[in-house]
């Protein structure tokens, strides 16, 4: 009986070590091709140039995108809470990737594939910032790994408030509007 437990323990330990080494190899491999994220600390999105008449009326708006930068402190709490509720309920408690969210999405997507329903994502707001600022929209496992690595690094480098500020000023909200302020006009 003791040999059985010993063999099971060795088997489980071997699986754990194999899994750990595999993860380290994947992380090391992808870390070499990760874009530099440090510019996000001081990033300000491009805003439109506006021309006003002598009496203060807007004459022209020169831009391809409608965009108005709003600092985190000026974004209404209801707007922040709405996005957190819809996009990333655990934003303030995860380290960039929400393990529970990933597991939920895997389970739900297996069920959705079986019933021909739409697949759901598990990207956190930080992962969306990584994708929108640093990666392409390519749908691939490689991009998701890079996105996760970047999310962990961004979370170590920036405050949660700064990450939300970037997200809420960069997200496309339709009709050419980028960011919550431009979308509110």
Regions found by a protein language model. Name each.
Residues 1-185:
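Juxtamembrane regions of bacterial inner-membrane/periplasmic proteins
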């Amino acid at each position: 009986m003791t040999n059985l437990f010993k063999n099971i323990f060795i088997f489980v330990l071997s699986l754990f070590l194999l899994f750990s080494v595999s993860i380290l190899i994947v992380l090391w491999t992808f870390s070499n091709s990760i874009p530099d994220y440090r510019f996000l600390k001081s990033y300000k999105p491009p805003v439109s140039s506006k021309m006003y008449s002598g009496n203060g009326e807007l004459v022209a708006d020169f831009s391809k995108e409608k965009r108005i930068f709003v600092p985190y402190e000026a974004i209404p709490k209801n707007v922040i809470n709405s996005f957190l509720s819809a996009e990333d309920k655990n934003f303030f408690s995860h380290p960039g990737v929400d393990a529970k969210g990933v597991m939920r999405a895997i389970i739900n997507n297996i069920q959705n594939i079986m019933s021909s329903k739409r697949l759901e994502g598990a990207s956190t707001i930080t992962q969306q910032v990584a994708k929108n600022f640093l990666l392409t929209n390519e749908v691939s496992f490689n991009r998701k790994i890079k996105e996760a690595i970047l999310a962990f690094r961004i979370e170590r480098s920036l405050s949660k408030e700064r990450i939300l500020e970037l997200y809420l000023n960069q997200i496309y909200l339709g009709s050419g509007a980028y960011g919550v302020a431009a979308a509110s006009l």
